């Protein structure tokens, strides 16, 4: 899976669940946590309003 497809799939996963942990994303796509953090940063830089909290996970901000 290329990066664009993976980042899109991560966005869909974030839209379908209230909170998603980085480890869940890493396990689902067979990638490292560092790659998850880079992909999340790419989503944020493209304008997706994300909230992340250590030990809790990532979610899309409402509003």
Protein language model regions, located:
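Short, basic/aromatic recognition patches that contact phosphate-bearing ligands
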Residues: 1-63
């Amino acid at each position: 899976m290329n990066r664009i497809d993976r980042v899109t799939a991560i966005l869909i996963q974030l839209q379908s669940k209230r909170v998603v942990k980085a480890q869940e994303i890493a396990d689902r796509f067979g990638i490292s946590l560092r790659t998850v953090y880079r992909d999340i940063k790419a989503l944020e830089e493209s304008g997706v309003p994300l909230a992340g909290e250590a030990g809790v996970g990532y979610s899309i901000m409402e509003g």
